[in-house]
Amino acid sequence: MRVGIIGCSGRMGTLLSSLLRSSNRFTLGPGFSRQSPYSLDSVIESNDVLVDFSSSSFSEELLIALLSNPKPLIFATTKPEPSYSVDEKLQRLAAYVPVVVCPNTSLGAYVQKRLVGLLARVFDDRYDIRISEVHHREKKDPVSGTAKELASILCHTKQEAWQQEYSIGSRCHSVKNIELHVSRVGNISGEHEVAFISDKEHISIHHKVFSRAVFAEGALRILDWLIDESPPPGCYGPEVGLKVSM
């Protein structure tokens, strides 16, 4: 399988390129970045599958090109805000090829999301909720895709389990608030914590990445799944691509 990386000259693109070069299952094809000598259309044409590690500002352009020449896609980028246009194009592309939407390809990050969903069902509104995320100072996203996913899981679960409406930064009395704290400091690869805090106790689920290699390894795991399972067209989540059963 020939793999093309969108955002090939970035930190994640460079790490995944190194893993692919040492793999006996995959061939590293031409990648795309603003500095690469290849056009986006030629990169799509030359590869069997694409991994997007670029940026949210490029998502629309990439998906428009892919809709003209559909190829399987691992979408490992934070969606832009608002995301409805990108979501619509991802769904259209998924009618033709398998699309794995996984803004955070770390196995630990996926497990954290599942645990957060479980705790949101257990703890009622006597527990305040706080999401904290820390990344390196060069990260462009004002809020990480993982933090957005965690907030979405909390809001959905609270509505489903408790019939309570939650949102980030709510100042409305009828909508309960999820506090969000974002830091961009140093060279931190990624850190996310979700805390449930009452007057009497505090429980938190904390995931910290020590090396960005974990994201590249997660992407490789999803590529393995694409080869092993040959899934039909459709939109898949990280639990399928990362081969996790919980």
UniProtKB/Swiss-Prot annotation:
Transmembrane segments: none annotated. Its EC number is 1.17.1.8. GO terms for biological process: diaminopimelate biosynthetic process; lysine biosynthetic process via diaminopimelate. Signal peptide: none annotated. It is an enzyme of class 1 (oxidoreductase). NADP(+) binds at residue 34. Gene3D superfamilies: Dihydrodipicolinate Reductase, domain 2, NAD(P)-binding Rossmann-like Domain. Keywords: Amino-acid biosynthesis, Cytoplasm, Diaminopimelate biosynthesis, Lysine biosynthesis, NAD, NADP, Oxidoreductase. The active site is at 135 (proton donor/acceptor), 139 (proton donor). (S)-2,3,4,5-tetrahydrodipicolinate binds at residues 136, 145-146. GO terms for cellular component: cytosol. GO terms for molecular function: 4-hydroxy-tetrahydrodipicolinate reductase; NAD binding; NADP binding; oxidoreductase activity, acting on CH or CH2 groups, NAD or NADP as acceptor. It is found in: Cytoplasm. PANTHER family: 4-HYDROXY-TETRAHYDRODIPICOLINATE REDUCTASE 1, CHLOROPLASTIC-RELATED, DIHYDRODIPICOLINATE REDUCTASE. This is 4-hydroxy-tetrahydrodipicolinate reductase. It comes from Chlamydia abortus (strain DSM 27085 / S26/3) (Chlamydophila abortus).
